[in-house]
Each structure stands twice: as C-alpha cells, then as structure tokens.
Amino acid sequence: MASAEIIAVGTELLLGQIVNSNAAFISQELAADGIYVYHHTVVGDNPTRLKEVIEIAENRSDILIFTGGLGPTEDDITKQILAAHLQKQLVEDEYHMNKINEYFTSRNRTMTENNKLQAVIIEDSIVLNNDFGFAAGMYLRENNHTYVLLPGPPSEMKPMFTSYANPLLLSESGDQNILESKIMRFFGIGESQLAADLNDLIVTQVNPTIATYAGDNEVVVRITATAKTKEEASRLVKETEEEILRREGTFLYGYGEVSLSELVTAMLLEKELTISAAESFTAGLFQAEIARFPGISKIFKGGMVTYSEETKQSILQVSPQVIKEKGVVSAECAKEMAENVSRLCKTDIGISFTGVAGPDSLEGHPAGTIWIGLSVKGYETEAFQFVYGRDRNHNRRRAVKQGFQLIKQFLDAN
C-alpha cells in the first residue's frame, strides 16, 4: 500500500501565524482513498532545509505532497528546489500565463515580472489547473516517487486537490485496499475511562483499529478498517461499532462531524419544540451556540442573562425567598429560572444555568459547581447538579454541552 507524506512549506506556519489546516484536509481525503499518511512535515522558506526534507521524505514515503511556496515572491521556493533536486528545468505553462495576463489587462494594470513565476512549472509534470487563483499546481512521477505540488491558500488548494490531484492519485493506486472509517462521539465520560473500558479491543484488534481522542469536553472514537471491497470494510467497522455501543452506548451522542449542539438543534426543529434559556453561570454561551444554526428562529424565541441576584429577581422573577433561603447555587433557583424563562418567552422548553464558574467559591460551594434546570411543558421541572474543575472558561463551555446533552436525553426518552 502506498504511503504519503505531506510537506507544508512556509515560515509563517512555523511561527504559528497560520494554522496548517491543509494537512488535515489532505489526510482525510487520502484516508478515504486507502493511501496512508505516515508523516506531516512543516519546513520554513529555506532552500537548504527544504532540500533536506525532500531527501528524508523520499527515503520513507512513496508520495510527496507539497503545499505552499508556489507564489510570486522570493520566499516561494518549492518548485525551484524540487526541480533542482530532480535535475529538471522550469518551464512556462501557457494556460496560467494567459490567465495572469488577462487578469492584469482587464484591470488596466501592469503585470510585474515576479507574477510570471506563478505560471512556471517543472518540466514533464502534469499541470493542475488553479481555478481560484494563479499559481499552477503540478503532478510528477519520477524515480518511483509521485510529487504533487499545491498552492498554500486553502481556497485554492482544496478544489485543486479534489478536482485534479486526487483523481490522478486514484488512477495510480490500482489494487489499493479500501479504507473505511467511522467516527463515534461520546459525552459524559472521560477519555481515560473510555479507553480503559475498550482496552481489550484497542490492544488486540489489528483490523479494524480503534483510536480514542479527547475533544472539546467530549471523547471521539475512530474505527478504521481495510479490505479489498467497501462492503467488507464496512462490515468490519460495523461489528466493532456494535461492540462499542454494547459497552458505552449510554454516552454516545452522535457520529461523524456533527456536534452535540447541532444534533440537538436539528431534533428540536424536527419536533417543532420551541426553547428559551436563562443563563447566569454561562453568561449567554448557550444562546450564542444555539443561534449559530440556520433556521433557529423557528424554535429559539430568546433568553436572558441574569448574572446578579438583583436581575434574577427583577427580570427573571425568581423568588427573593428562594434566593435568600436556598441561594443562587441551588436546585430551587435553577428550576425557577427554567420555568420562568419558559413562561416569559412562551416556549415549550426552558433551560437554565446557575452556579460557580470559578476560580473562587460562592455560598460555600466550590468552583465548578453548577445546577442546570430543565422545564418542559407538560412535565415536572428538574434540576441537575454537576461539579467540574477550577478552570472558569472550561467549566462554562462544558456546562453548555451538558445542557444540550440533557435536552437530547429528554428528547430521546419522550
């Protein structure tokens, strides 16, 4: 099976000024092709170091995919260094040169000489058209290696890879095994606990393989299988998925790239259930999250951020007696907040967040203590307590996700 290495060229990547999202995209695409990516390399705009990286990559990878360094400036050196390494000439590509000329002519501007560099390619390479920019891409087979050169901007790189580079890679792959992956998403269990529960599967299984990753207050499990056919690979993945569900299905909330909040929002839209929120602990984060999704105005009627005792009483109409006797960090306060916001906004569901974000304690409660209230029309209002750590912003994000999980659990059960 062919192995690939992705080489990102650009000092700005090493300085942390730009995130290397290109590598993640290409890796996902190659995985679907059954081509394994074993190495990601980032190198600055330095000729000596780039040449060293090329030599190292050739010794361990069949396919070398470069991103960046194809532009018009002096530090765009990728094709120059690779051409010299392969002892090949640089030649002009007519299509891209005409495209650049037409651009400047149509705007009555004079093209500087350095812009012509974007239309220069390595001889004997297949030109990859840049439909959204000027820098030509290249695909080259030489000395039992495949070299793919792509521009750095993702808006240019992604369509070039998808439309031109990937079909060429697939045409060369021949009898490559099919690689099938499935992403499972869990909430309410830590990565270490989940990994321990699945340890026998993780250690003993070779095909499929199982990997766990800690996400943003969640755990992601990836199952990956290889086989000669897609049907066989899917069967292998399915068998492992069913065993994981048997053990940890309680904590599963979804699959693939769909977030918990997106999933719950879709469920609310499908059921045509309206919702409102009263927030203290989370200070509007829940409302900001649910408002991200298209069509949300059909079900999200509004909410309130009542951070102080005074606003809880004056705006949200929480009973002064409840606050005096039970405190704002209490089940009683959370319930009243949820019920009142639902009543005031005239919604089917009201959710509330009140607690101690941290790092200091409040009313004798340690940092990270939170009560989430859930009021649903026709059902008894409930309040749920959780105790997190001392990291204030981490606690707030986790509470928002916890709120969506509570809504999902209710919708699943009713």
UniProtKB/Swiss-Prot annotation:
The family this protein is said to belong to: Belongs to the CinA family.
Record-given protein name: Putative competence-damage inducible protein
Domain of life: Bacteria
Pfam families on file: CinA (PF02464), CinA_KH (PF18146), MoCF_biosynth (PF00994)
PANTHER family named in the record: NICOTINAMIDE-NUCLEOTIDE AMIDOHYDROLASE PNCC, NMN AMIDOHYDROLASE-LIKE PROTEIN YFAY
Residues annotated as signal peptide: none
